[in-house]
């Protein structure tokens, strides 16, 4: 598996819920050094979608760059943003449309997901 393959591994529904929650709370102008992006990257890595230590380039998996790119992906798919609803995967678009008008439900679901992978 090449580094690009690791970076492009499809996000799961739970992972996308967490990213969308951050996008709705903070927008798309988050930098890779933003504490929220760093924390989300760490949470996604703890979710153990794949055994990270067995990947050829483990630092690339759900890295801060990957998280920032996925946040931008939600912006690209957002019909409320000029030029939205293009270039993103079906699951990304579906989750955005599902929760667009139900942000409280999204925040609640995201909190439940985060609590399962909390370090505290």
List each language-model region with its residue ranges.
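Intrinsically disordered, charged low-complexity linkers and terminal tails
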Residues: 1-120
